[in-house]
Amino acid sequence: MVNKNAIILAAGKGTRMKSKLHKVLHQVCGKTMVEHVLTQLQAADIQNIVTVVGYGADTVKDALGDQVRYALQKQQLGTGHAVMQTEDLLGELAGQTLVVSGDTPLFTAATFNHLFQYHEQRHAAVTILTSKAPDPTGYGRIVRNEIGIVERIVEQKDASVEEQAIHEINTGVYCFDNQKLFAALKRLTNDNAQGEYYLTDVIGILKEEGEIVTAYQMEDFDESMGVNDRSALAKATKIMQKRINTQLMKDGVTLVDPETAYIDTDVQIGQDTVIEGNVVIKGRTTIGADCLIGAGSRIEDSTLHDDVTIMSSTLERSEVHSGADVGPNSHLRPEAELGENVHVGNFCEVKKAYIGAGTKVGHLSYIGDATLGKNINVGCGVVFVNYDGTNKLHTNVGDHAFIGSNSNIVAPVNIAADSFVAAGSTITDSTEQFDMAIARARQVNKPGYAKKLPW
């Protein structure tokens, strides 16, 4: 089996992005561009991957971790110079090496595999990945002879009128015979106006040496899109989102309006779940089967089991078990967990709390730092008072308890199972089973006193 290597070029600054963030670390559908490239290389069964870093090297290393090895390009002197920096790691190896830019998030593993296969079948020294561009302006053109053999790559500024009419373009991805690549790099010079070492010049060197130079033309031009500015980032995101949404629909998920379903790459959604319009689902969210995610919802890094309904609400790092429903207009903050058939109605907030099966929190309530048992009724306007100005404190509520509307539960307390908290109470002491707790001033009516008031 032929050894397969890859080099990811990720050293450039990307000034056109106008950003403090290194270009390849901008995200497309929840994953950085360079991570998209790495994921597809790994899916193509390429395990020996070197990333060339330079500007923002530490941040790129933080993003990719130990999944790859790194070569440092201290000065950005061109793509050929970048590949030279990998010689200590790759120079002595046999096999094939794919070179790809870290700002091309749309390439797929299938395309990489086809490129490798084409290259190997033709025993080439280098195979250029090409595509047909609807508008080739700005791209290097692939010039072939009368029998289709690649003669050269000509850049836009150097192209004749006839060459400018060519629609086959260089995508900037190459598959090299590894040893021939590094041998040719030793002959590479920077004798050009920019004083840089161009990887495309290696192709000319190999051609001069009589090596086989081929080009594999892929079908989907969109894959080759490089991202250099915010406009291109938005376009790449739209293309990626369409891919994600199309696959979800093929897998049995209903997207009412695919154009406004913003779903990240790593999200998983079960069959017969319905996603309405203007929904954002981010991070490593998993949604089960037969769920309904209502319009205007935002869900991030959360787990929803089967048959869950979320209406116009926000969930962050939360878990919702089967049969539960949330919203409209509620917020599950990190470490919220709802048991089976829990109802959290409108304008509620739950944070770092477990709510047991069958419990109902109807409206306008805050539950934080608490554990609630099963089949509890939490009335309107109940507040779990969890912060004393220094510490967050915990409250427990037992099964079948009833908490009346407009009550304050001041932590730390334990509301026992089957106990009853009267409406309007401020509870500061724990209760025993079957207690009724009432903590409010007795009402006093003063006859005729309202006439004396200034309103």
From Swiss-Prot:
Residues 252-455 are annotated as: N-acetyltransferase. Pathway: Nucleotide-sugar biosynthesis; UDP-N-acetyl-alpha-D-glucosamine biosynthesis; N-acetyl-alpha-D-glucosamine 1-phosphate from alpha-D-glucosamine 6-phosphate (route II): step 2/2; Nucleotide-sugar biosynthesis; UDP-N-acetyl-alpha-D-glucosamine biosynthesis; UDP-N-acetyl-alpha-D-glucosamine from N-acetyl-alpha-D-glucosamine 1-phosphate: step 1/1; Bacterial outer membrane biogenesis; LPS lipid A biosynthesis. Binds 1 Mg(2+) ion per subunit. GO terms for cellular component: cytoplasm; membrane. Its cofactor is Mg(2+). PANTHER family: BIFUNCTIONAL PROTEIN GLMU, NUCLEOTIDYL TRANSFERASE. Homotrimer. This is Bifunctional protein GlmU. The lineage of its organism: Bacteria, Bacillati, Bacillota, Bacilli, Lactobacillales. The gene is glmU.
